[in-house]
Amino acid sequence: MLIYDTKLKQKVPFEPLAPKKANIYVCGPTVYDDAHLGHARSAIAFDLLRRTLELSGYEVVLVRNFTDIDDKIINKAFKENKSIQELSSIYIESYTRDLNALNVKKPSLEPKASEYLDAMVSMIETLLEKNIAYKVSNGDIYLDTSKDKDYGSLSVHNSSIEFGRIGLVQEKRLEQDFVLWKSYKGDNDVGFDSPLGKGRPGWHIECSSMVFKTLALANTPYQIDIHAGGVDLLFPHHENEACQTRCAFGVEIAKYWMHNGFVNINNEKMSKSLGNSFFVKDALKNYDGEILRNYLLGVHYRSVLNFNEEDLLVSKKRLDKIYRLKQRVLGSLGNIDLNFKKEILECMQDDLNISKALSVLESMLSSMNEKLDQNPKNKALKGEILANLKFVEELLGIGFKNPTEYFQLGVKESEKQEIEKKIEERKRAKEQKDFIKADSIREELLNHKIALMDTPQGTTWEKLF
């Protein structure tokens, strides 16, 4: 298994800390709003990593957190007259619904920052005892980055550009020093009583503490195998996580770092400041979650994905082909084509090379359709095809529906009943040799994007996109 390590800037063999086990921490959302397509892409990217590792024989523990203590949450909670717990719970539920719709496997653990305050306080106390952290006059506590000789080694940033983002805070020793603890500032703030004084943790210390408490291995130079997240988190978040873990525990937080690329909307980086954020829940109003997943996984996880509906509809044709083949072979699972399994898995074992994997999939679909044309009643062949498609489902998380359900997506139950009535009406018209009426009914349904197919078993229908 090869993965691209952001720190080394190259593909490297994945050699876990424990044989055939993989511990992965994925930075989850700050839950002050609904999930956008960037969140969805990150979740799907590392869901693919997990699936690939599991099918390669690894025992995977994947932890994805919820940041439920943050300035944005506090500000919005006060604005909406809610507690931060109420607000964050709303968006945790929303995020979970969205990812379920996208067929993202549930993480092994989903810690909330608010559940690990003691661990955060303890870690900050360690940094204070080591004289690596310092308190300023308003009670805030910062980490002195000059004490970490490796600071900047992960992101390899340009300090004159990147540190300018952070801004100069009075009494900070260095501009790049970052906050570990924010003291309670009064009525429009949130604070927790602690040995550090009343206050709340900074963003970066939250993730480091959760990694330590949920995944960290003892007596190794690294706490976990893989730390993952969006490339926008590389600096300052992941850089600061790595720094404070080195300083507190004397080890690296992760052996490997993996980052997924941005999502652009019509060639512009998606951001709330530009007003072009695309919420997953809004996309799901127009497209089934499987169709959206199929599109988002179709571009290599490290590349920028330029979201547009034209490309989404083109990518849907791949799903259509899967379900067309599945439609032809409903029955019992047989023996998988071992060459196909090996070939597609090896593609994904090469840093999730999805373009090659999808090419292998397309070849299999074409080949199996040709074989079926020649041997339409061959049960062993049908069983093999179903086994191949089942492996695709397990590896890529697509193709898991019943074909009829898939081809009728987006049609309400009441509408289905009306369509069936029209089909019966058309059947009677044909029996009475009233072919003009029969054709009229077909055209009427087609105008509503419902296509009829006459088969030896009767008339079936599909929803057109």
From Swiss-Prot:
Give one GO term, molecular function aspect.
ATP binding
Q: Which residues bind ATP?
A: K272
| Cofactor(s) named in the record | Zn(2+)
Q: Where in the cell is it found?
A: Cytoplasm
Give the domain of life: Bacteria
- Kindly state what the record says about how the cofactor is bound: Binds 1 zinc ion per subunit.
Broad class of enzyme this protein falls into: ligase
Task: List where the motif 'HIGH' region lies.
Answer: 29-39
Checking SUPFAM superfamilies in the record gives: Anticodon-binding domain of a subclass of class I aminoacyl-tRNA synthetases, Nucleotidylyl transferase
Q: Which GO terms describe its cellular component?
A: cytosol
Q: Which reaction does it catalyse?
A: tRNA(Cys) + L-cysteine + ATP = L-cysteinyl-tRNA(Cys) + AMP + diphosphate
* A GO BP annotation: cysteinyl-tRNA aminoacylation
- Position of sequence motif 'KMSKS' region: 269-273
**Keywords, ordered alphabetically:** Aminoacyl-tRNA synthetase, ATP-binding, Cytoplasm, Ligase, Metal-binding, Nucleotide-binding, Protein biosynthesis, Zinc
Q: Any idea which positions bind Zn(2+)?
A: C27, C207, H237, E241
The main place the protein resides is cytoplasm
- As recorded in UniProt, its EC number(s) are 6.1.1.16
Q: Record's HAMAP family?
A: Cys_tRNA_synth (MF_00041)
Q: Which family does it belong to?
A: Belongs to the class-I aminoacyl-tRNA synthetase family.
Oligomeric state and interaction partners are given as: Monomer.
Q: What is this protein called?
A: Cysteine--tRNA ligase
